[in-house]
């Protein structure tokens, strides 16, 4: 008997399914995710292979990204504990950024698979929901690890009347994070795929450039909100 998850039934197009035990997983998401992870690892190896005191090329790019993400995490989480969460925020940003740019630049859907369509990882609702749930888990872990059971006072501040609203908020956070990212990236990817198949190469370029811009913005929004939620959990006072 197969285990069916409601979110896993939400799909656009056809999927390449891999069966592992009682689970059907989207194989094309794993394939494209491995491509993204491989690209990130290749850039990191290339940029750190011969470190120089005066950074140039890829090393300079990596140091710029490090400084930018460090400042983002410090501003949203706070000076006290931001270092603990910088790897998490940085990983989210880089994975989403490269996935989004891949969806904007590469017409994944014209790549033929035995079944299904290849697509950017962030164009699959299961990927974005999984990352949003990770952010929610990080929120609770950050709060409990820093404040203990006093963390739950957050739900009745400034007045106990806020309790039901804050409980509802915990459900809307992952929903808004996941569907915002999924919808924007899927729309960009579909636009690039359709135009690339219907018109010459130069015509889709404006759409691709717009897709690159919105893809970068979506990665930044996701990472910033993730850092903000974690900061909200660890701060003695709300933002």
Swiss-Prot record:
Residues that span the membrane, as ranges: 27-47, 86-106, 125-145, 190-210, 211-231
Keywords, in A-Z order: ATP synthesis, CF(0), Hydrogen ion transport, Ion transport, Membrane, Thylakoid, Transmembrane, Transmembrane helix, Transport
GO cellular component term, pick one: plasma membrane-derived thylakoid membrane
Top-rank lineage group of the source organism: Bacteria
Keyword Membrane assigned: yes
Pfam families from the UniProt entry: ATP-synt_A
Subcellular location: Cellular thylakoid membrane
Main location: membrane
GO-annotated molecular function: proton-transporting ATP synthase activity, rotational mechanism
Membrane topology, record value: Multi-pass membrane protein
Coiled coil (residue ranges): none
Sequence similarity: Belongs to the ATPase A chain family.
Free-text function comment from the UniProt entry: Key component of the proton channel; it plays a direct role in the translocation of protons across the membrane.
Subunit structure: F-type ATPases have 2 components, CF(1) - the catalytic core - and CF(0) - the membrane proton channel. CF(1) has five subunits: alpha(3), beta(3), gamma(1), delta(1), epsilon(1). CF(0) has four main subunits: a, b, b' and c.
Protein name: ATP synthase subunit a
Organism: Synechococcus sp. (strain RCC307)
Gene it is expressed from: atpB
